[in-house]
């Protein structure tokens, strides 16, 4: 009678044997070694013998033109910003808000002690 760990190891060995017959149609990863599909190997210009020895997939695909174009499309380009202009707009908005203090929805509360809530309790 086989134990559960022995059965699982046997199952894994059978699966690996099945994958070995068809290894270029299956992508698998073991100890950070990449087994790439045959089509990916052709794209990268890598010999099929070298596929199992790759340590990083990024190394092979890093410098292709397609990847550079894709990076350029995804890169966000920001305009130059004039900080003085933005500060002037912010101060103008603040001035507009302070001029209209009676129409604002916020209530103003005086600083200092609150006489209503700080009353002495008569029977404490």
Curated annotation (Swiss-Prot):
Keyword Lyase listed: no
Family as reported in the entry's similarity comment: Belongs to the CLV3/ESR signal peptide family.
Gene Ontology CC entries for this record: apoplast
UniProt-annotated stretches for the region Disordered: 87-124
PANTHER family to which the protein is assigned, alphabetical: CLAVATA3/ESR (CLE)-RELATED PROTEIN 45, CLAVATA3_ESR (CLE)-RELATED PROTEIN 45
Swiss-Prot/TrEMBL GO biological process terms: auxin-activated signaling pathway; cell-cell signaling involved in cell fate commitment; maintenance of root meristem identity; phloem development; regulation of auxin mediated signaling pathway; regulation of cell differentiation; regulation of pollen tube growth; response to temperature stimulus
Composition bias type Basic and acidic residues, residue spans: 87-103
InterPro entries: CLE45-like
Signal peptide: 1-20
Intrachain disulfide bonds: none
GO molecular function annotations of the record: receptor serine/threonine kinase binding
Coiled coil spans: 71-109
Glycosylation site list: 25, 96
Protein name: CLAVATA3/ESR (CLE)-related protein 45
Keywords: Auxin signaling pathway, Coiled coil, Developmental protein, Differentiation, Glycoprotein, Secreted, Signal
